Design a protein with these regions (language model features):
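N-terminal membrane-targeting/pre-transmembrane regions
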Residues: 1-76
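Juxtamembrane/interfacial segments around transmembrane helices
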Residues: 52-62, 106-116, 132-143
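Transmembrane helical hairpin unit
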Residues: 58, 66-82, 89-103, 109
């Protein structure tokens, strides 16, 4: 019964994320027309869908490990070590939701000629900055390990008056966004921090 409930929770979370993915959006046509000379730095649908599938796969593996732990606990208590792994895998689905929500809360526009970046926010004021004048520090916050080809993380860019956070989902849209992220990598000392769950 407990596993049925866990499975239902995962299914509901998955359906809610899929619904958010299909219904959410900026008024992109108008935005694209207004920003001549700027490239939209975004995550592609294939990248998002691939990460969602991997996250669901990891979460289901977590459910299986919990089931194995409970079934074998009375006979082999050493299987308890599987529980932390199981909850870690379950966390991937909620981590995806966190990063996807951040992804859809903002749009990043980049002008490669002027190095100007315009941030369009769903909530809050829009703002601009220059990559070579306004960036004070760059960090990468990422998971402690890659699991089944899945590595969650985000860039944390400290500006003079703002903090810009960009999920790895955006950086994975290659080669479309290579110039933007290559410019950052080549001109700033990026400090990497490892976390169990890199929640934005």
């Amino acid at each position: 019964m407990r596993f049925l409930i866990i499975g239902l929770i995962i299914l509901i979370a998955y359906l809610m994320i899929r619904k958010k993915f299909s219904l959410f959006g900026f008024t992109e046509d108008m935005s694209r027309n207004l920003k001549s000379g700027f490239q939209l730095i975004e995550a592609s649908s294939p990248v998002i869908q691939a990460n969602l599938k991997k996250s669901v796969s990891n979460a289901m593996m977590g459910v299986v490990l919990i089931l194995i732990t409970v079934l074998l606990f009375m006979k082999i208590k050493i299987v308890l070590f599987l529980l932390p792994i199981a909850f870690f895998l379950l966390g991937y689905l909620f981590l995806f939701n966190n990063h996807f929500s951040k992804l859809k809360s903002q749009q990043i526009w980049y002008n490669a000629k002027t190095n100007e970046v315009f941030i369009e926010q769903l909530k809050g004021e829009n703002y601009t900055f220059n990559m070579f004048k306004d960036i004070e520090a760059v960090q990468k916050i990422e998971s402690i390990q890659t699991t089944k080809g899945l590595l969650y993380g985000y860039y944390r860019i400290k500006l003079k008056n703002k903090i810009l956070e960009i999920p790895y989902l955006v950086a994975e849209n290659k080669p479309a966004n290579n110039l933007f992220f290559d410019t950052i990598a080549q001109n700033f000392n990026i400090v990497t921090q490892k976390r169990i769950f890199p929640i934005i």
